[in-house]
Amino acid sequence: MTGAFVLVAGAVVAPVGAGAGVAGGDTEYLVLLEEGADRSQAVAAVKAAGGEVVKENANLGTLTVRAAASGFVGRVSASSAIEGAARSRPIGTVPRAEKPLSVESENGGSGKVAAGKKVVGMDPLDAQLWGLRMVRSDLARRVQPGKKAVKVGVLDSGIDARNPDIAPNFDWKLSRNFAPDIPEIDGVCEFSGCVDPVGWDDSGHGTHVAGTIGAAVNGVGVSGVAPNVTLVEIRGGQDSGYLFLGPVTDALTYAGDVGLDVVNMSFYVDPWLYNCTANPADSPEAQAEQRTIIRAMTRALNYAHRHGVTLVGSLGNNHEDLGKPRTDLSSPDFPAGTAYPRPIDNATCVDLPVEGPHVIGVSALGPSSTKADYSNYGTEQIEVSAPGGWFRDFFGTPQFRTNGNLILSTYPVNTLQANGLVDAAGELTPDGIALGAQKQCPAGVTDYTKCGYYFVLQGTSMASPHATGVAALIVSQYGKGRPGGFGMDPDKVGRILMDTAQSRACPNPPLLTYTNEGRPAEFNALCEGTRNFNGFYGHGIVDAWAAVTRR
């Protein structure tokens, strides 16, 4: 792990005085320089505080520093050249951990899936993709299937580029991994230097997201909302599911530097579900860390936006109104077992990146177009809604609690094998079939590693890529050439996305309860607003057809 990092084009430069490491060092920090501060003064402050600079992001004004955990933040922040510091990535000995994804894998084994009928211009499994039909991608592709010149960044756990639905659209040259494996939390490193190559994904999350955005129409498996756009991996996530500050900000900077058009962000920045400026429940050091995370993410999001990147983010799976947040019981989620109750003040706390500047927030719907029970909502943060899957949709019908209510997309075979859903020979196991795994091979292919594998998940993580795909179609339809490639003002992209969304009124009555679905009163959700804009649907359900045919 020592010395392992990825260069960000034009932004992250070689280590300053990188050596064997700091004695007793066990944490990597992101140090935020004051605007206009003297760099040499900042580096001197880091050294005086006991840290070692290993990487610099000059465009954001950040230093990645390795230092002993005890007292470093307070010491370095005392310098007038430093605005703050926050943990970027753990690099020392910590308990083995994995971020839970219980919402996304809620299905307990119903193999029921509607067979459907193959549609012209679609792929064999697309009949199961009710989300494509809800956002009318099946119609939009007849007018605009997306342009190769439009580049969509997937800031996630990686992308499995071996999948035949991903391979035709994957950009090997531009893709980068900003999150080297951390053995203490990710397990034994499979690759030299603990850096997974681009085109690899142990988690599966990023591959699932990428397929929904832009799986190719190729006669195999599934197709995405924008099946002809280019997919770029800008990995910021660990195999264990965590996304820490340093890799995320580096990935966003890179997205701006290389001219990506849209970036999907289906995550929140660990370890804090909400970052607060001065929460009384937090220690002074924790408060300082969160202020730094807010400032660093704000810089990174603003940087990407200024460079023409449309930013799309998931609202989250905590079933709460983000404008009226409940007590946070899950933070910090790293290291494991350190969370404590934190009352959240909406005026001084934010969920990042979705509550950061320029991010289009997306809520999740089930196939009935009802807000999924798990999905966050709220008029302050939402822009649009999109299909995210809801296992418990259609209560009282045979479709209740079936895999057909979830989102089917591309998935890495290695991840399915690690979870016992595919065997060593590449065949689906009974558990895999029950949980919704599927397999399709191109004609004449007998090597299972060249086949397509697919899996069902639910979450706002699945809703956001539907909106990202529509945004990519908007850039494809209305974008123009610009220095370094093709593109469109992200504010204009956002306006079209929202203006062409299918308006949906709040339910009547507006208080939606999920008692029949087996949820406690905590899940009850009050929809506020008008038909044209409300807390469940925002401006409406994203509509690819309306977006590419507007006049």
Task: Name these PLM-found stretches.
Residues L30-D38:
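Short, surface-exposed ligand-recognition loops at beta-strand->loop->(often short) alpha-helix junctions
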Residues K117-N228, D250-V258, V262-T292, N317-P332, ...:
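Active-site core segment of subtilase-fold serine proteases
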Residues M1-G21:
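Secretory targeting and sorting signals
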Residues V43-A127, P367:
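Autoinhibitory propeptides
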Residues A336-A472, W545-A546:
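Extracellular S/T/G-rich loop segment that most often corresponds to the catalytic His/Ser-adjacent loop
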Residues R141-K147, S223-A226, Y242-M265, N275-A281, ...:
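Mature extracellular/periplasmic domains of secretome proteins
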Residues L30-V31, T64, K151-L155, G211, ...:
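Structural recognition of the beta-strand scaffold that forms the well-ordered cores
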Residues V54-K55, I91, L260-F267, V445-T446, ...:
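C-terminal subdomain of the subtilisin-like protease fold in secreted/lumenal serine endopeptidases
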